[in-house]
Amino acid sequence: MFNFNASRWTRAQAMKVNKFDLTTSMPEIGTDFPIMRDDLWLWDTWPLRDINGNPVSFKGWNVIFSLVADRNIPWNDRHSHARIGYFYSKDGKSWVYGGHLLQESANTRTAEWSGGTIMAPGSRNQVETFFTSTLFDKNGVREAVAAVTKGRIYADSEGVWFKGFDQSTDLFQADGLFYQNYAENNLWNFRDPHVFINPEDGETYALFEANVATVRGEDDIGEDEIGPVPANTVVPKDANLCSASIGIARCLSPDRTEWELLPPLLTAFGVNDQMERPHVIFQNGLTYLFTISHDSTYADGLTGSDGLYGFVSENGIFGPYEPLNGSGLVLGGPASQPTEAYAHYIMNNGLVESFINEIIDPKSGKVIAGGSLAPTVRVELQGHETFATEVFDYGYIPASYAWPVWPFPDRRK
C-alpha cells in the first residue's frame, strides 16, 4: 500500500495493552500535587543533554526546558501560545525559572513546540535547540516545521542564563511523499525533532512525529496493519482515519542545518493517530524506540493508555521493531487516574520524566489541570520487556555527568 517498508504497530499488538499492569503504571498522583510556578503552565519537558542522549550539567547546574504559557490562558488553549522556557537547579528537582529561551525574533511562526536541546559536540558552551516552529490560523495548525536555533549557555553561583537564540533555521517539513502534509489532512501531525548520533554508522539523524502520507480516510487498512486478531474481529471503517508514524531524517552538514527525509521507521496506520516526541536509547546491543500517545487518539475499536510506548530492534535504528511488552505500553497512567501525566521522556539512565496533565477529583469528578512536573519513575529495560521499579520526587531530572568545561563562573554583563 505504501511506497516504503516500515515496521508496523498492529491492531493485534495494541489489543494487548493492559491498563492494570503495575509494572507499566505510573504512581497515582493526588489532587494536592505541588505546582512549580503559579503563573505558568508547563508541559513537554526535556533536559540539556549531549548528542548521545545523556543529560548533562553545566558548571554545577542541572538545566531543563519546558513548553510554557501564562496560567491566565485557559488550559486547553495553551498550545497556540507555547514558548520554550528554561529552568535550572543544583539538585535536579528544586527548579528556578530563567525565562524564555528564544528571543522574540527567533521564531518566524506563532508558537514554539517540542524538540530537544543539545550541547554542540566539541564546544565549550554552544547550545543548539531543535524545535517545532508552528503556525496557527483560525483552523488550527497550518504549518509545522522542524527548526534549529543556536546560542550559548553561561553560569555563575547564582544561576544560568543564555545568549543568542535570536534567529532560527528551518530544517525539514512534511513532504506529502513519506509524510502527510496539510493538503492531505488538515489534522496532520509533524513535530518534535529529536537529534542523535547513531552508534552503528556514526551519522547524525533526527526522529520526529508524523503521519503516513495518505489522503485522510481514502486508504483501506490491510492485513499487515491488522495482524493476527481473534476470529470475527471487526475493524471499524473509520479506523483508517488514524495514520501515525515515527519519521527519521539524515543530517547532511556538519553544522546540522541541512537534512534529508528518509522513509518512516514505524507506522501505526489503523491503530493510532499520534506517536509524539519520539526518542531513542541504545543499550546492550538493542535499539529502543520510544514515543508517547493518548487513549483518545487510538483508532475506533481500540483503547489504550496515556503514556510512554516503546519498540525494540535487534538490528539497529532502521529495525525491524517489535513492541515492548508485546503491546508497546511502557508506562501509562494508573487505572484510577488514566490522564494524570503525559509527554513522558525516558533518559539513558532509565529515569522517566513527564508532566501532570489532568487529575480527576475523586470526590467531585471535576478535572483539575496540572501544568507542572510529575513524579519521576525508573524503568528498567530487560530485552523485550520493561519494568517500572522506583518512584522519585516530582520533577527529579538529574544530569548523568558534568559537561567538560572550566568550572569558573561566567561574568554577567
Swiss-Prot record:
Its main location: secreted. It is found in: Secreted. GO terms for cellular component: extracellular region. The record marks 192 as: Transition state stabilizer. The keyword Secreted applies. Disulfide bonds: none annotated. The keyword Secreted applies. The active site is at 44 (nucleophile), 276 (proton donor/acceptor). Gene3D superfamilies: Glycosyl hydrolase domain, family 43. It catalyses: Hydrolysis of terminal non-reducing beta-D-fructofuranoside residues in beta-D-fructofuranosides. Its EC number is 3.2.1.26. InterPro entries: Glyco_hydro_68 (IPR003469), Glyco_hydro_beta-prop_sf (IPR023296). One of its GO terms (molecular function) is levansucrase activity. It is an enzyme of class 3 (hydrolase). One of its GO terms (biological process) is carbohydrate utilization. Keywords: Glycosidase, Hydrolase, Secreted. Belongs to the glycosyl hydrolase 68 family. This is Extracellular sucrase. It comes from Zymomonas mobilis subsp. mobilis (strain ATCC 10988 / DSM 424 / LMG 404 / NCIMB 8938 / NRRL B-806 / ZM1). The lineage of its organism: Bacteria, Pseudomonadati, Pseudomonadota, Alphaproteobacteria, Sphingomonadales.
